[in-house]
């Protein structure tokens, strides 16, 4: 079976899922992008048999109804008040987003923006897998932004990873999307040089100023 990478968050899902695809391909991992976890794609699509990973954008609506979805890597990009017509409170919305991680096991990965992680902790949400954090603002994150440099403080992988000035994408929100993709590569042991080439060449999807 191919493994799932699930990406959720209020903003940045499309850009990040495409960045993650680029990073996977740079590491010779076969991947396909999907946008709906209503169907267990791995069991249905014959072509996924040849895949290593299915990279999925996951909305809060899909997370409301999912019971069994288990991404081997779950990414939470950010949490901002959204769909307020649908949820009774921001806390409620955040709890729904956290369902991305509910079926994970201890060897799975949670890649989570520091600020989103603080919010989940305040709601007593537990992340079962191994956790990596990122942030454009918080320098205590595993990967953070300092004067345009993406810097890691992960043991055995520390130091500057990437200069945003070398990338087509710009701005702190895109820096965070890039950090999430780099951390997927780190979890899968994809060489940094290969990832950097893919990320630096990446152009934003059309109409995705975010």
PLM feature segments, named:
Residues 1-114, 118-130, 144, 185:
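Phosphate-binding loop of NTP-binding sites
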Residues 90-91, 129-210:
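Adenine nucleotide phosphate-binding catalytic loops in nucleotide-utilizing enzymes
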């Amino acid at each position: 079976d191919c493994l799932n990478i699930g990406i959720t968050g209020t903003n940045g899902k499309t850009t990040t899922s495409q960045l993650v695809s680029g990073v996977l391909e740079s590491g010779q991992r076969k991947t396909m992008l999907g946008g709906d976890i209503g169907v267990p794609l791995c069991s249905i699509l014959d072509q996924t048999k040849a895949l290593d990973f299915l990279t999925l954008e996951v909305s809060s609506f899909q997370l409301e109804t999912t019971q069994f979805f288990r991404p081997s890597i779950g990414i939470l990009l950010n949490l901002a008040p959204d769909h307020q017509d649908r949820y009774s409170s921001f806390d409620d919305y955040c709890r729904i987003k956290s369902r991305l991680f509910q079926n994970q096991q201890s060897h799975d990965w949670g890649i989570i923006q520091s600020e989103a992680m603080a919010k989940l902790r305040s709601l007593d949400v537990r992340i079962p897998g191994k956790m990596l954090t990122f942030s454009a603002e918080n320098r205590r994150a595993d990967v953070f932004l300092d004067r345009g440099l993406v810097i890691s403080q992960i043991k055995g992988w520390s130091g500057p990873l990437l200069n945003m000035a070398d990338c087509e994408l710009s701005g702190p929100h895109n820096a965070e999307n890039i950090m999430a993709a780099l951390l997927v590569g780190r979890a899968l042991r994809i060489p940094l040089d290969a990832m950097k080439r893919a990320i630096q060449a990446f152009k934003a999807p059309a109409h995705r100023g975010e």
